[in-house]
């Protein structure tokens, strides 16, 4: 497959690792244990940090989490903060599957994602025009297509990721 800098790059192309991890049966109990190493940044409830430095992971589709970690490991998503934690020498494919199931089953803290609320009508208009087709009517995403849940995600995180996608900095989305 073409590298991320290539115009032929496909954001959701299958990778051998992603495909292999998706075939594994994740165990939420083992995922809970493995998540201990993630809590420093993403917090015990998976809510991340309100300033958007660390995203909410609670309630995210397991397939999306697996894709993102696989992309980081393959160098298809730049995320220097995650490199030390997502490396192949740190976390196994089975642990990724376990973590993904555990996080998917966590309750989404919906109040997380609220921005200032100053332009709600315009935000809704933009969402319906540009985002709804993939992320759904209520930000629920689509696990089968690797479209993430955006409902409840931190407002500053969303702004940063949207800007990075538009600038071509984040090309795996």
Question: Model features per residue range: what roles?
Answer:
Residues 3-35, 50-53, 104-126:
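Electrostatic cytochrome c docking/interface patches
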Residues 49-56, 72-106, 111-117, 144-149, ...:
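Axial heme c-ligation environment in periplasmic c-type cytochrome domains
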């Amino acid at each position: 497959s073409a590298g991320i800098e290539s115009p032929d790059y496909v954001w959701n192309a299958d990778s051998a690792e992603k495909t292999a991890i998706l075939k594994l049966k994740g165990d939420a109990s083992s995922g809970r244990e493995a998540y201990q190493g993630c809590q420093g940044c993403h917090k015990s409830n998976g809510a991340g940090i309100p300033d958007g430095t660390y995203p909410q992971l609670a309630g995210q589709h397991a397939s999306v989490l697996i894709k993102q970690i696989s992309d980081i490991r393959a160098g298809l998503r730049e995320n220097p903060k995650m490199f030390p934690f997502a490396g192949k020498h740190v976390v196994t494919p089975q642990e990724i599957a376990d973590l993904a199931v555990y996080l998917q089953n966590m309750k989404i803290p919906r109040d997380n994602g609220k921005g200032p609320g100053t332009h709600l009508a315009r935000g809704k208009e933009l969402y319906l025009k540009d985002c709804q087709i993939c992320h759904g009517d209520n930000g629920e995403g689509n696990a089968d297509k690797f479209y993430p849940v955006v409902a409840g995600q931190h407002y500053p995180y969303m702004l940063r990721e949207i800007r990075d996608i538009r600038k071509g900095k984040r090309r795996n989305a």
